[in-house]
């Protein structure tokens, strides 16, 4: 069976669709759509239009209401008349098979949701056999309950009893149902094979981790695109792929780092994101085991991002879901060089908002909140890097003495360039 991981980024135009609900206000919806646009651009698409609608919850049939769907349809039609074809419509939440089928029937263009878009980017980014296997398994998990949509063209073959003796559902009797069941079996068999491969990879990686010697393991964690790989490069003096795109890192990279005369292992991990598909987290178990087995987590945060506090919450929740919560953790607020704020006029008596807070005020707030267990840096501009190394050195040394009290682990004094 041909492997499912094939994804070439081609420039296509896209429309984004999101909802404003009781639990997601207009500001948050805008931030989610900004992120969705960044995802679309990472996948190779150009966003030409956004549509939002206020609803108590997503419409179970078409996600948005009938009127909004008609509005989107009219926009696509107008673009076609102006010889500007819309390649796809991307929805900010995961769609059911029924929703995708109904929306496609109305809009007549490719329909994606946030999950399928993330999976596509992961497929594009996967380089090693391990990453490709993990992505392929996640893709099949996503595709399996949506198989029926892939066979809607068989509904036109008629409703005769066929070989199935009339036992299938309306529109899926006969050869359609047979093919659907065959495909389901093929995919289930393929998934079983992929799981066996990943189990073997898990075993190999577990052995590798045990053979790394008596050194403290430190893992860089954080939201996607916060600068983990750039920081990894600075600390390890190696060249880990770093790019201003989402999910630039899929495979974990482990490097031996020496600060002064203290060696330890540093791991760069895949970035987290809001609404990260559960199947993706499950499929990347072997990769995320590096987080579970770390002695110290360095949580990297992009402080210049307007919604960095929610990103912190997303990462904390994901770490808790991985059963890696409770580990010694320090927060590194990165990108201080990119932080901006709007100064209020002297006669403006309205309360300060997030955009009016200076970096100094923010630093004081978070240092008090975290009991000074944080530092503010710029990996790109190398601001406060010496201070960061000193903090890491002290934390790793303390952990090493606790974990390996009788191990003479210090190297001969190591002079950094």
Language-model features: locations:
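N-terminal accessory targeting/assembly segments
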Residues: 1-119
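C-terminal-of-GTPase-core extension/linker across diverse P-loop GTPases
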Residues: 1-16, 37, 148-226, 232, ...
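Switch I (effector-binding) loop of TRAFAC-class P-loop GTPase G-domains
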Residues: 2, 210-213, 234-264, 273-283, ...
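Switch II of P-loop NTPase G domains
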Residues: 2-5, 30-34, 57-74, 251, ...
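Conserved catalytic network of the ASCE P-loop NTPase/AAA+ motor domain
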Residues: 8-9, 77-84, 256-260, 265, ...
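Conserved Switch II/interswitch segment of TRAFAC-class P-loop GTPases
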Residues: 23, 55, 59, 94-97, ...
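Switch/connector loops and helix/strand junctions flanking conserved nucleotide-binding motifs
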Residues: 24-27, 58-62, 97-102, 119-122, ...
């Amino acid at each position: 069976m041909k492997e499912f991981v094939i994804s070439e980024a081609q420039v296509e135009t896209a429309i984004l669709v999101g909802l404003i609900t009781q639990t997601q206000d207009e500001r948050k919806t805008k931030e989610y759509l900004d992120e969705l646009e960044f995802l679309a651009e990472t996948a190779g698409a150009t966003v030409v239009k956004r549509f939002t609608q206020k609803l108590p919850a997503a419409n179970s049939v078409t996600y948005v209401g009938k009127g909004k769907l008609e509005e989107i349809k009219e926009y696509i039609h107008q673009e076609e008349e102006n010889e500007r074809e819309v390649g796809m419509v991307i929805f900010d939440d995961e769609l059911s098979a029924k929703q995708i089928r109904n929306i496609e029937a109305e809009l007549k263009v490719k329909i994606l949701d946030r999950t399928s878009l993330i999976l596509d980017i992961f497929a594009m980014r996967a380089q090693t056999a391990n990453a490709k296997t993990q992505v392929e398994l996640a893709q099949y998990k996503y595709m399996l309950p949506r198989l029926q949509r892939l066979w809607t063209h068989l509904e036109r073959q008629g409703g005769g009893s066929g070989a199935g003796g009339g036992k299938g559902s309306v529109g899926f009797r006969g050869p359609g149902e047979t093919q659907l069941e065959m495909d389901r079996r093929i995919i289930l068999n393929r998934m079983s094979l992929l799981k066996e491969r990943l189990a073997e990879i898990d075993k190999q990686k577990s052995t590798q981790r045990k053979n790394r010697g008596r050194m403290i393991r430190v893992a860089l964690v954080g939201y996607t695109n916060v600068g983990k790989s750039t920081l990894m490069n600075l600390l390890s003096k190696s060249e880990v792929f770093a790019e201003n795109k989402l999910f630039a890192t899929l495979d974990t990279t482990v490097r031996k780092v020496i600060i002064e005369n203290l060696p330890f292992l540093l791991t760069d991990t895949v970035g987290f994101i809001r609404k990260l598909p559960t199947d993706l987290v499950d499929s990347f178990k072997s990769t995320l085991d590096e987080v579970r087995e770390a002695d110290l987590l360095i949580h990297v945060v992009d402080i210049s991002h307007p919604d960095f506090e929610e990103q912190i919450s997303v990462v904390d929740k994901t770490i808790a879901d991985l059963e890696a919560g409770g580990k010694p953790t320090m927060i590194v607020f990165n990108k201080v060089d990119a932080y901006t704020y709007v100064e209020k006029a002297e006669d403006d008596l309205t309360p300060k908002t997030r955009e009016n807070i200076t970096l100094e005020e923010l630093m004081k707030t978070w240092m008090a909140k975290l009991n000074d267990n944080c530092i503010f840096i710029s990996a790109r501009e190398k601001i406060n890097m010496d201070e960061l190394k000193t903090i890491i050195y002290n934390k790793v040394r303390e952990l090493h003495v606790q974990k390996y009290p009788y191990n003479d682990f210090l190297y001969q004094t190591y002079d950094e360039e």
